[in-house]
Amino acid sequence: MLVVLAAAACAPAHGAAYEAAFGAAARDEGAGRFEAAARGYDDAAKRATRPRDADQARWDAAVVTTRSGNVAAAAGRFEAIAADATSEHVAEAAYRLAALRIESGDADLGWRDMEQIPRRFPTHGVGHAAVRRLVQHADEQGARAGLEELHALERDLGATELVELIAFATAEHLEALGDDRAARDAFVRIADRWPYPFGAFFDDALWHASLLDEKLGLYQGAIEDLERMLRQRETTSLVGSYERQKYVPAILRIGELYRDRLHDRPRAREAFHRLYAEFAHSTLRDEALWLEAALWHDDGDADKACGRLGTLVREFPDSRYVPCALKQCPDLERARNSAAPPECHDYIARMTESPSERDEQRDGR
C-alpha cells in the first residue's frame, strides 16, 4: 500500500482538464475518428499545464492527422513542430515532414530535406533512419550510386556516431560491386575500429569477412574471423550463455571449413563437439553430434562414432537424427517415449557430404 501511495505521489500532475481531453482524443483515435482525434489533441494541448504535455499533444495531433489522409494539414503540423526549438519532437518532425513530402508527390523537396536530417541530427535515431533511406534511394540507380552517396555522407559525418553505420554500408556495397578484397578489408577495419562490446556491427562485420575470406580461398583466415567473434562470448551463472545471433552459425561454419576446405578432420570434429558441449541452449546440439559422429565413422572409428550417437539418442530422444543413429549403430535403443521420426531420411545422410560430393550427386557423376 505504501509503495502504491509513493508512486502516486511521484506521478506528474497533468491536470484534470488535460487528462480528460487527452483521453477523449485517444478514444477517438482508437475508434478511427482521426479528424476528431486531432481536434481533441489540439484541445488537450491548450489545456495542458506543463509544456511537455502540450508538446506531446501537438505531436499526437500531427501523427493522427497523417492517419486521416490530410497530407497538407499533417505537413503543416510537422513543419511547425520542427521549427519549435523547445519541442522534444523537432528531429522526428523534420524526418516525418521529409518522408511525407517524398511520399505525397513533392519528392525533390522531400529528398533535399532528407539529406539534411543526418547532418542536423546525427545523434538522434532519425539520423540512422535517414542514412539508410538515402542510401536505399541512391541504390535505385545501382550499387555504384549508393556507394557515391555513402562517400558523400562520410565526408560530412565522419566525426559523428553515424560513421559506423556508413562504414558498414560501404563495405556491403563494395561486396555487392564484386570488389571482394576491398570489402573484406573494410569489414575487418570495422571490427578493429569498433570492437565488442561497443561496436554495433562487430559480429556482422566478422561474419561477412569470413564469407569473403572463404570466397578468396583464405580458409584459415575465414576460421580466424569466426574464432575472433567467439572469443567475445560471455557467460553468466544466471541464464547460462549469452548467445548472440551469429555465435552458433559461427562455430558450425568453423567445423564445416575445417572439414570441407582444409580437410582437417580432427579439428572439424573438435569444432562440432564444441557446439554440442559449449552451447547448451542451441537447438543444433544434436546436429553437431551427428556431424562429429559422421567424421569418426568415415575415419573408421566405429566405437567413437557410436559413442557420440549414443549421446545423441539419450540426450535428444526426439531428434530427427535418432533413426539414422539407430541404423548406423544397431546396439543403440530408441527411448520408449521418443517422438523421433520412424525412419532415417536420405537428406540427413547428405548433410555430411562435402561441397564437391554434393556437386557430383547433383550432376550425376
Where are these regions (language model features)?
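Acidic, polar-rich low-complexity tracts and alpha-helical solenoid repeat scaffolds
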Residues: 6-365
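Sec-dependent signal peptide recognition
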Residues: 1-3
